[in-house]
């Protein structure tokens, strides 16, 4: 697949092969990661990368865009069909760019943005001080209830009435429960705010019809195209409002982006078609079944699951009672070729670089074909490591690490992904 690269730049090729082996022989449990199909990767690596195409279909600033127009229109039409939306912009380079585009289409710098606190499951772009969203807008945050660790909608309503935000954001990067979009829209309407839903994490579940579709309720919906959607790295914006759509288009180009990445847009089109298949719907159902099975199995091994479980593809493990940090367990699991990420939890007392928890997701292992029985194996490995972390650097007994690595490789070999590409 990469013969020309191998002959022209062996240094990059060797690094690529090392990453390929890491992905093939390791357990990927980062909730925001997945394995794109070869079709998606072929489109992303295609000759579409050669073409500049500032503007939109039929309204370009460069000549020679007739076939670029075809592929971008196809991507837009498929996105609209997939999510039952009237309008779609497929040009955002990322989820963060999509969020910036949506914000600037709905409000001005200095206006009030209301989003979920990062430490309670939100995202950097939902108002974190270090992010553009926190720098450009007056931010008011809501979180989860201390007891249930789920969203208290009455409290969200109280905060919204007090703050009178211009935009309310629903969605997050580490919230494991289904969100009541209807309730959020009622709150937004009550205070005269726009409702924006960031469905970057659960878009694949929405596409498969096993999660409520926020397009029915939100003024604007943003998403990434990787994660559960299993496409290339990129973003999209959806709306049913023609005026908002016009504003979004102006903000994306020429407002915050120049030439779109048409090779990635082509790959988005491929991913959207894949997401319309019956196989994809069954895949998403299995993602959730695996997530529930893995969280339940870990809970049975005395690891505390935030909110007591999950409705989606991800969940948080609170490590406070084990007296280890998320940073330490992330490193310890990494030594065993199991990849997770440290994550803040509700009532967090440590810095975001250390944290009291880890986030776990099942999209990637489910893409490999793993099911509930394999989740039991994975839970046993995680629990064994969690109970044997020696220090803050995440060191564990070398013999134990080798034993678990061997089990990881054995499991991965039963469910190959890109094995035929390894040299």
Curated annotation (Swiss-Prot):
Classification via Pfam families: SHMT
PROSITE patterns assigned to the protein according to its UniProt record, in alphabetical order: SHMT
NCBIfam families according to UniProt: PRK00011.1
Protein name (database record): Serine hydroxymethyltransferase
Catalytic activity: (6R)-5,10-methylene-5,6,7,8-tetrahydrofolate + glycine + H2O = (6S)-5,6,7,8-tetrahydrofolate + L-serine
Swiss-Prot/TrEMBL cofactor(s): pyridoxal 5'-phosphate
Location in or out of the cell: Cytoplasm
Entry binding sites for (6S)-5,6,7,8-tetrahydrofolate: 118, 122-124, 351-353
CDD domains for the chain: SHMT (cd00378)
């Amino acid at each position: 697949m990469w013969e020309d690269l191998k002959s022209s730049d062996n240094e990059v090729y060797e690094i690529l092969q090392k990453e390929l082996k890491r992905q093939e022989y390791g357990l990927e449990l980062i909730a925001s990661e997945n394995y794109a199909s070869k079709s998606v990767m072929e489109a992303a690596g295609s000759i579409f990368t050669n073409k500049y195409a500032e503007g939109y279909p039929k309204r370009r600033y460069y000549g020679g865009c007739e076939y670029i127009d075809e592929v971008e229109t196809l991507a837009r039409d498929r996105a609209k069909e997939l999510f039952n939306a009237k309008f779609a912009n497929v040009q955002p380079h990322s989820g963060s760019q999509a969020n910036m585009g949506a914000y600037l289409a709905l409000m001005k710098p200095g206006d009030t943005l209301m989003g979920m606190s990062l430490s309670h499951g939100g995202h950097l772009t939902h108002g974190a001080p270090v992010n553009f969203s926190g720098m450009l807008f007056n931010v008011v945050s809501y979180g989860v209830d201390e007891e249930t660790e789920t969203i208290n909608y009455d409290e969200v309503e109280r905060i919204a009435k007090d703050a009178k935000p211009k935009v309310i954001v629903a969605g997050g990067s580490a919230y494991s429960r289904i969100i009541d979009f209807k309730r959020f829209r009622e709150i937004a309407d009550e205070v005269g705010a726009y409702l924006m839903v960031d469905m970057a994490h659960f878009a694949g579940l929405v596409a498969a019809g096993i999660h409520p579709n926020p397009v029915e309720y939100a003024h604007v919906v943003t998403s990434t195209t990787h994660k559960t959607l299993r496409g290339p790295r990129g973003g999209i914006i959806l709306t049913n409002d023609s005026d908002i759509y016009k504003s979004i288009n102006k903000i994306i180009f020429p407002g915050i982006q120049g030439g779109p990445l048409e090779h990635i847009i082509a790959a988005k089109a491929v991913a959207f078609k894949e997401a319309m298949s019956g196989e994809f719907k069954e895949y998403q159902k299995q993602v959730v079944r695996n997530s529930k099975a893995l969280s339940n199995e870990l809970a049975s091994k005395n690891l505390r699951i935030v909110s007591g479980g999950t409705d989606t593809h991800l969940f948080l493990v609170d490590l406070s009672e084990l007296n280890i940090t998320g940073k330490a367990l992330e490193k310890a699991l990494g030594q065993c070729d199991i990849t997770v990420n440290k994550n803040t939890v509700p009532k967090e007392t440590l810095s975001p670089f250390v944290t009291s928890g880890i986030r776990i997701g099942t999209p990637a292992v489910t893409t490999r074909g793993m099911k509930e029985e394999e989740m039991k194996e994975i839970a046993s490995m995680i629990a064994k490591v969690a109970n044997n972390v020696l220090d803050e650097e995440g060191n564990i007994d070398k013999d134990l690490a080798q034993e678990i690595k061997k089990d990881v490789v054995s499991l991965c070999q039963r469910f190959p992904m890109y094995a035929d590409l390894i040299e």
